[in-house]
């Protein structure tokens, strides 16, 4: 444990930030998994709906720096390609 006041404050702030980041990440994951599940089921309409729900959330998290912008683009591109294969 830190002895210096600023180090104690920093530890508290880091823990608070860690909880917020974990919460946002866990909020994002089900939207991605919902699209994958719809593709495995072969339901194009449900997959498209899941993609439309997932896209703004992934973009928002990338804009806030939670995930890298290339990772967001990769999620969207992979899901779009899989949806197009279902046609």
Curated annotation (Swiss-Prot):
Biological process per Gene Ontology, one example term: translation
InterPro entries xrefs = Ribosomal_bS20, Ribosomal_bS20_sf
Q: Which UniProt keywords apply?
A: Ribonucleoprotein, Ribosomal protein, RNA-binding, rRNA-binding
- Per the record, what is one GO cellular component? cytosol
List, in alphabetical order, the Gene Ontology terms for molecular function in this entry: small ribosomal subunit rRNA binding; structural constituent of ribosome
The cross-references to HAMAP family, in alphabetical order and at most eight, read: Ribosomal_bS20 (MF_00500)
The UniProt entry's sequence similarity note says: Belongs to the bacterial ribosomal protein bS20 family.
Name the chain's protein: Small ribosomal subunit protein bS20
State the organism named in the record. Shigella flexneri
């Amino acid at each position: 444990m830190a002895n210096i006041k600023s180090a104690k404050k920093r530890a508290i702030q880091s823990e608070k930030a860690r909880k917020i980041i974990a919460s946002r990440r866990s909020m994002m994951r089900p939207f991605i998994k919902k699209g994958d599940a719809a593709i495995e089921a072969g339901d194009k309409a449900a997959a498209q709906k899941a993609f439309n729900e997932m896209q703004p959330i992934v973009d928002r998290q990338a804009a806030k720096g939670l995930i890298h912008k290339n990772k967001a683009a990769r999620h969207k591109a992979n899901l779009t390609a899989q949806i197009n294969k279902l046609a």
